[in-house]
Amino acid sequence: MPIIENHRLVNDPWQHLDETSSLTGRSMVIVPLARLEEALSEWPTGHRGLGVDLPNSARVDDIVQHLARLDIVTVNLPAFNDGRAFSQARSLRHTHRFSGTIRARGTFIPDQYPMLLQAGVDSFEVSTRFTLEEWVAEAHAVPATYQRDYAAGAGLSTRPFAEAQSWAEQPHYG
């Protein structure tokens, strides 16, 4: 799949490994979450080039202790109406201050591109169904932000996190 970073198509240096592929002699690999512990134990300390594919059903807290050793985390959008990857990306980038690459994969369209950028995603595995121009045009097509905390000049570093409630702590009706 094509990769978009900084509004440009780029070559993808990353290899996605499955549950059984060997890590030996490889670099720039993304492993399934189920293999992360194994990969970390085999990966030389201080060696870069390791990433994890975070299922949308997983909690970011499952990988927080390993973020310093990861260069990329992929978040998955298995369906257009499944927005859990937005929350995962936001948590990685803004709550846990992950400085590596966050890549979106799966079923999303150019209309979602600006919101994914606002959530902290900076790399995209995109469908060939749309042109690069269509993706880039959408990057600035939404004049308002999805949440006011993402507005220019009102970065999350100024938000009172101590007073914020997680989604699970908020009252829900219905």
Where are these regions (language model features)?
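Alpha/beta catalytic cores of nucleotide-metabolism and tRNA/nucleoside-modifying enzymes
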Residues: 4, 99-101, 110-112, 124, ...
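A positional/architectural concept
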Residues: 9, 13-54
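Structural preference for beta-strand elements that scaffold enzyme active sites
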Residues: 28, 49-51, 72-74, 101-103, ...
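Active-site-adjacent beta->alpha loops and helix N-cap segments on the catalytic face
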Residues: 34-42, 80-93, 132-142
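Acidic (Asp/Glu)-rich catalytic clusters
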Residues: 40-47, 61-70
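Short beta-strand/loop segments at the ligand-binding rim of alpha/beta enzyme cores
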Residues: 45-52, 91-104
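Catalytic cores of alpha/beta
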Residues: 52-54, 60-65, 109-123
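Residues lining hydrophobic/aromatic ligand-binding pockets adjacent to catalytic sites
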Residues: 83, 97, 105, 111, ...
